[in-house]
UniProtKB/Swiss-Prot annotation:
PANTHER family reported in the protein's UniProt record: AMILORIDE-SENSITIVE SODIUM CHANNEL-RELATED, DEGENERIN DEG-1
Protein name, entry field: Degenerin deg-1
Assigned keywords, A-Z: Glycoprotein, Ion channel, Ion transport, Membrane, Neurodegeneration, Sodium, Sodium channel, Sodium transport, Transmembrane, Transmembrane helix, Transport
Stretches in topological domain Extracellular: 104-711
Pfam families xref list: ASC (PF00858)
Compositional bias (Basic and acidic residues): 154-165
Upper lineage: Eukaryota, Metazoa, Ecdysozoa, Nematoda, Chromadorea
UniProt function note: Probable sodium channel subunit. Required by a subset of neurons.
Amino acid sequence: MSNHHSKTKKTSMLGREDYIYSHDITNKNKKEKLNGASKNNDYNQDDDDETMKSKMMDFCDKTTAHGAKRVLIARNSFSKLMWGLIIFSFLLMFAYQASKLIFKFSAHEKITDISLKFDDVEFPAITFCNLNPYKKSLVMMVPSIRDTMDVYDNAKTHSKSEGEKKKPKVSRKQHSDASQQMVRELFAKEIEEGMVELKKSNKTLQSQNKSGRRRSQRSIENRRYEAIEAHCKCVGNIGMECIRFESPPRDPSSKCICTYDRDMEVAWPCFNISVWYDHECPLCHDDGYCESTLPSGTTSSDKWPCMCRNRGDTSERDDTPYCIGKAGVGKIEIRKLWLENNMTTTSTTTTTTTTPPPTTTSTTTTTTTTPPPTTTARPNQRAIVSNPETIKAMGFQGMTDGVAMLTRAKENLMFTMAALSDKQRIALSQSKHEFIEMCSFNGKECDIDEDFRLHVDPEFGNCFTFNYDVNNNYTSSRAGPMYGIRVLLFVNTSDYMSTSESSGVRLAIHPPTEYPFPDTFGYSAPVGFASSFGIKKKVMQRLPAPYGECVETKKVVDRNYIYAGYDYHPEGCHRSCFQNGLIDDCSCGDPRFPVPEGYRHCSAFNATARTCLEKNIGSVGDFHHITQKMDKCVCKQSCEEIIHEVTFSCSKWPSGATDLGDCDGMTESECEQYYRLNAAMIEVFYEQLNYELLQESEAYGLVNLIADFGGHLGLWLGFSVITVMEVCVLLVDMISLFFKSRHEEKLLRQSTKRKDVPEDKRQITVGSGRKSDAFVSI
């Protein structure tokens, strides 16, 4: 009775279907035990109860996954089929979703977080360079450099004569005259009607019987440009441009003649008075520029008073000199700039005492040109200058464009300088105290000797780096131009080489441990201005592989990296690959970049090396773009990079109230003009003391994968972590049962063989069987 009561209670606790399923399993297990007990085998028959089928049924009965149990407790085959299809469909859906999750995880996507950091901001290193790399007065003392410049000067002279022979060059003035003539033709009717109306309304016109001389004089006075005498300081070659002052000249040697613009009230350019000569030009244009001779086939009886000078540095008079009309009275009188500025009414005349150069051409209607292929721009040149191999190596053959020739001359200068030692190149460029006159940082005076370090650049010569010491780094306490670096730099334009197109300063902003690269990442500041460079700091932190490709280590140990002693930079990597490729092919390197230890740069005068270099540069292309020839070179970004964004502004400098430096023997106005033409004020400062942190992070990591994987398991199959553990236990049991059944089958076969052996041989067989059993038990 009690047994029946307990059975009823158990049935009520379980569901009906669960009870039936459990009862069937119990009866089935009992039957299997009875059948197993009836068999007479040599091994334990109780292990047969743990069959794979019973394990699966027991798992489905007790698992926390609800779907599998529904198949086994279904009342009919249709229900089992439906539940099986549903579970299988959900299993496929889960597999699809799981594959997408795995694909998303394997893509290693990343996101960039941007945040503002308020912390101490270290001031970057600033490298200052003169746009003129070497002093003209010094480089012309070195034979190899002088030869390089002579080849350039000869090429310029030759290209001008060749251009005149092939196709006469049309001047800007001739283009302007042609445009005026076209307008006259297009608007001839309107112009004629306007002139008729003007004549009718103007009854006070001057008589037309005045002399042609006075008419010519009056026309000159109304034109825009004229020659004017001024006070100048001329330094260097006599043909170089002079520095003009507003004050009267102290002596005749300080006089110069300038081209005066009436509209702008500016006198520029100015040249020493000794290079000018008086002339009577047969033709002067409406703007004031004159022609020393008439074009072929034209005649004129006019005689316009003008001042002329040679366009080149030669002492002989040019066939086409630069001429500008005079507005003074008489043949050799000229207006004085200092009198115009002081607005004096006293008429002061000065007679020029310069001796005009010997005239080699007569003023006729026909002109002759002498072909100058063998003419040199400067006398007493060495034989190597006219050597055909030298001319071929320099690459001026066939060039007529002045800009292209200047670019080529700059390259040739770098080739020549690369053959010199560092000590020799340093001596030819500006020294620290010549270049840097004044400096302050954070409102305090700098120590020019200690705070600036020399940096020799292949293109800009001597450069000087501020804040180069990592162990003693400057930090800005405030934002604004007053609390950064303010430096007065003297570039001395009077000593500029002919290859320097513009006057000013080149600066690069970079971390102290990185190479400056002023040619690529630099900024230019002109003379005569206070240039302000406001900077904002950004820190970029990139993820390494597998999320991205970046270089984690800053120190470079590769011997092929040509910028030894500096941190890794992608620009340095590209240049190193480019340079090493050229060395492999030509056995010499490009002078724009350093060479590894034991190698040399290509010679400027070696045509074979230059040809090989040009050929390889043409095949490789820009060293920033990897081609098939550089496919082995992989240049990655740094994992941590400091970026400085720069904004530029400028104002005219000096103001007139500025306390300037070395102005011995000059008035205040002369000193101001002197510095305006030769110096630049530079300000570099932080616009704000916070900085942006751009940090990469993984967009989908392992934690996200596990969470989404578990969510889909629970959604489609009703699985949890416990269910996963149950499946793992089931797999272990199934594997152990498989190997156990294989072992028992082996024992059964051995037992069967012993029964078939004759009795006289069974002892040996039994012994061997025991040995096998012992081996299995081990």
